[in-house]
């Protein structure tokens, strides 16, 4: 692929917005969860989580082990890789409108739950790479050719070997490509073939990853327990409902202020936009009922892939970092607004910018809270150390 001037401008704008959004992390990134252990011992350890490609990448960039703490370099590299991946699909989804493309694609990072992913000193690189590769994989497969299905399957294995939750991003971008074709009035037969190709690439890659990698590498009671699927019996429906309610409680806990009504407004904007898109698509179209049904299915699927297959797990991980799909959903909402109201670009851009502003304020507050928590924990550890020394424990 050759980068034109619009691609270069898009990458510049996107990286500028990303730097503003992640500025506290780029200037001072605290140790988060697994970071401290890796900084102390220089170990890898991602393979046991079913993420061997993460081990491989850090082994290569560190020229072996022990791995070093090069923060914020992993985060910077991750954002750049994501920007490059998005530039590959910018023209298909947005044409020459690189400004709106930058604002919409920023929703992937501006996802309030993605703050946890970006906060890791090490994993921020591989998690961003996983999202980037999943987007490219979805795009490659959405072109009906046998070779593209093979390439997509390989890329699917790659992004699952980096971070499994990016599967939802693959699915939501597939929906984005479908709605793009609906707006461009592509034939139902072409849309169906491309969709089938994309689904095939995902399924083949997923089963190959599950059998050849996850089945052989995932170790530890924690990893094994959280990867179990709900048994197909009388408690199946009850388990799914329980998972949905648990994720809903997490949503409502994090997005519980008046300022965060802006995120809920995206859902209503999506519905209105899809109605407008349907009315435009079925005007003088012979496949009115088919396209109406397709758009309804797209709406339901976009909401499902906020959580995705995790609702079928016996003990899913209830943590913000697994909700990468929320960023994809936010992007999809903005994309539909863009398609529905192309003649009102200024209003759309103002709306998208306001969402980014709220998200940036939220992220700065979250980063400060993480930093304050780390300082508190550091203070407690220092006091314990001083007490131990004062009492004489450990002396010969």
Label every PLM stretch briefly:
Residues 149-164, 169-170, 175:
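Membrane-interface alpha helices of multi-pass inner-membrane proteins
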Residues 194-272, 310:
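Membrane-lumen/periplasm interface segments of specific transmembrane helices
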Residues 47, 51, 78, 99-142, ...:
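Membrane-interface micro-motifs in multi-pass membrane enzymes
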Residues 134-149, 183-185:
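Membrane-interface transmembrane helices that cradle and orient dolichyl/undecaprenyl
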Residues 358-396:
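Membrane-embedded, lumen/periplasm-facing catalytic core of multi-pass transferases
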Residues 170-200:
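Perimembrane helix-loop-helix junctions
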Residues 21-38, 45-57, 375-376:
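Extracytoplasmic catalytic/substrate-binding loops of multi-pass membrane glycan-assembly enzymes
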Residues 147-150, 339-363:
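Signature aromatic-anchored transmembrane alpha helix within multi-pass, membrane-resident enzymes
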């Amino acid at each position: 692929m050759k980068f034109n001037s619009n691609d270069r401008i898009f990458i510049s704008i996107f990286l500028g917005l990303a730097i503003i959004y992640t500025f506290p992390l780029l200037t001072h990134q605290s140790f988060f969860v697994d970071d401290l252990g890796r900084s102390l011992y220089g170990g890898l350890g991602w393979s046991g989580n079913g993420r061997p490609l993460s081990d491989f990448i850090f082994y290569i960039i560190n020229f072996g082990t022990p791995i070093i703490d090069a923060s914020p370099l992993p985060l910077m590299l991750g954002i750049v890789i994501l920007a490059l991946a998005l530039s590959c699909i910018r023209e298909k989804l947005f044409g020459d409108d690189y400004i709106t493309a930058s604002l919409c694609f920023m929703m992937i990072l501006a996802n309030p739950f993605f703050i946890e992913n970006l906060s890791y000193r090490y994993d921020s690189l591989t998690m961003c790479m996983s999202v980037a590769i999943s987007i490219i994989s979805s795009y490659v497969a959405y072109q009906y050719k046998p070779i593209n299905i093979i390439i997509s399957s390989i890329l699917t294995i790659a992004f699952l070997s980096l971070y499994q939750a990016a599967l939802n991003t693959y699915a939501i971008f597939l929906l984005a490509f479908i709605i793009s074709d609906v707006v461009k009035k592509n034939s139902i037969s072409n849309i169906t073939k491309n969709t089938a190709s994309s689904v095939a690439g995902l399924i083949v890659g997923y089963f190959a990853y599950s059998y050849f990698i996850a089945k052989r590498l995932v170790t530890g009671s924690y990893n094994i327990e959280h990867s179990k699927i709900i048994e197909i019996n009388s408690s199946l429906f009850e388990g799914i409902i329980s998972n949905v309610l648990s994720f809903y409680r997490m949503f409502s806990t994090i997005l519980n202020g008046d300022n965060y009504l802006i995120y809920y407004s995206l859902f209503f904007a999506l519905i209105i936009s899809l109605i407008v898109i349907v009315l435009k698509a079925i005007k003088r179209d012979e496949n009115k009922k088919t396209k109406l049904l397709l758009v309804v299915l797209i709406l339901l699927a976009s909401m499902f892939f906020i959580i995705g297959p995790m609702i079928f797990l016996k003990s899913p991980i209830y943590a913000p970092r697994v909700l990468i799909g929320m960023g994809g959903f936010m992007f999809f909402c903005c994309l539909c607004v863009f398609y529905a109201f192309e003649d009102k670009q200024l209003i759309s851009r103002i709306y998208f910018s306001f969402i980014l502003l709220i998200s940036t304020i939220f992220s700065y507050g979250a980063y400060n809270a993480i930093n304050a928590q780390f300082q508190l924990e550091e203070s407690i550890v220092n006091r314990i150390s001083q007490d131990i020394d004062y009492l004489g424990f450990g002396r010969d």
